[in-house]
């Protein structure tokens, strides 16, 4: 039987393991492990086996190991992890796709009952319907002001009732009622808090961004740059076309109001002197467009008319 490790030996072994993982992996998910049991954690480890490693530990030990690794290797990128090691957290080192690993972790959430004193992570609403409880159990509902009626010898909840609000502590009456109804309102599992990718740290929401989201954000950014550039008259690639158009309009306006002229301005001046030309141009365009098909139709009719054959051309008549 192997001798039991001392605390000092355990710390040395933990430091070595964490440093080795940081050498091998460049991507890490920082996860919250509140209310996650050992069996559940074991299942998560099995599910991620192959390209990911789950490491739990005390925050002080993890922070110390990260600093030791930075001092040994001169690589300070992992120091960005230290501010994230707060609360009941663990690390998932991975070589796989971060989004896929995050989705795999989310699969291992399990339902849990509402325990007394637990802070509710979500709102808990009891749905209307028959509870299957006998009338002697109505006291639970009365204490919680839940409207009920007796239907076929059992208690029936009339309307949906918000029993517990997110952030509130679960009371003894709420816990007892949910247990009687067989409702397990909460689900627990590892929750991704932050993502570390080769020195960069970002929110897990970034993993859910699609190509369309990125295109939309890029387009919005270009639009903002264009608006700002136009507002302060600072030339940028995005604003240049609009600046040229605005400048041309300004030059055209000056030419119209003065004797200065150029071919395009002459045309505008001509229209301004005789506005009726606008109407003539507008009528002429549709007429020309409709005239072309009519002419083409006539040409087709001419082509399709068969040449009439005469009896004389045949060299004899019907009465010969």
Curated annotation (Swiss-Prot):
The keyword Signal does not apply. Keywords: Phosphoprotein, Ribonucleoprotein, Ribosomal protein. GO terms for biological process: cytoplasmic translation; ribosome biogenesis. Residues 291-320 are annotated as: Disordered. One of its GO terms (cellular component) is cytosolic large ribosomal subunit. InterPro entries: Ribosomal_protein_uL10 (IPR050323), Ribosomal_uL10 (IPR001790), Ribosomal_uL10-like_insert (IPR040637), Ribosomal_uL10-like_insert_sf (IPR043164), Ribosomal_uL10-like_sf (IPR043141), uL10_eukaryotes (IPR030670). GO terms for molecular function: large ribosomal subunit rRNA binding; structural constituent of ribosome. The keyword Disulfide bond does not apply. Phosphorylated. Ribosomal protein P0 is the functional equivalent of E.coli protein L10. P0 forms a pentameric complex by interaction with dimers of P1 and P2. Belongs to the universal ribosomal protein uL10 family. This is Large ribosomal subunit protein uL10. It comes from Glycine max (Soybean). The lineage of its organism: Eukaryota, Viridiplantae, Streptophyta, Embryophyta, Tracheophyta.
């Amino acid at each position: 039987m192997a001798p039991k490790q001392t605390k000092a030996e355990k710390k040395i072994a933990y430091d070595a393991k964490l440093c080795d993982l940081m050498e091998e992996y460049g991507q890490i998910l920082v996860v919250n492990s509140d209310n996650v049991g050992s069996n559940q954690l074991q299942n998560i480890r099995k599910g991620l086996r192959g390209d990911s490693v789950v490491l739990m530990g005390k925050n002080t030990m993890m922070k110390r190991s990260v600093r030791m690794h930075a001092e040994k290797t001169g690589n300070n990128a992992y120091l960005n992890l230290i501010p994230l090691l707060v609360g009941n957290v663990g690390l998932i080192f991975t070589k796989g796709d971060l989004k896929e690993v995050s989705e795999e972790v989310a699969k291992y959430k399990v339902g849990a009952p509402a325990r007394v004193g637990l802070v509710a992570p979500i709102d808990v609403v009891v749905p209307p319907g028959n509870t299957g409880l006998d009338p002697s159990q109505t006291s639970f509902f009365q204490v919680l002001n839940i409207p009920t009626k007796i239907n076929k010898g059992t208690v029936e909840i009339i309307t949906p009732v918000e029993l517990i609000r997110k952030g509130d502590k679960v009371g003894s009456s709420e816990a007892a009622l949910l247990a009687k109804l067989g409702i397990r309102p909460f689900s627990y599992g590892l929750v991704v808090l932050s993502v570390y990718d080769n020195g960069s740290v970002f929110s897990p929401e970034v993993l859910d961004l699609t190509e369309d989201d990125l295109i939309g954000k890029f387009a919005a950014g270009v639009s903002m740059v264009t608006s700002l550039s136009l507002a302060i008259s600072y030339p940028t690639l995005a604003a240049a076309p609009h600046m040229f158009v605005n400048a041309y309009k300004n030059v055209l306006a000056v030419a119209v109001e003065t004797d200065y002229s150029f071919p395009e301005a002459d045309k505008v001046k001509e229209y301004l002197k005789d506005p009726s030309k606008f109407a003539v141009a507008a009528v002429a365009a549709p007429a020309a467009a409709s005239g072309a098909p009519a002419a083409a139709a006539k040409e087709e009719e001419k082509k399709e008319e068969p040449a009439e054959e005469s009896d004389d051309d045949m060299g004899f008549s019907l009465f010969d």
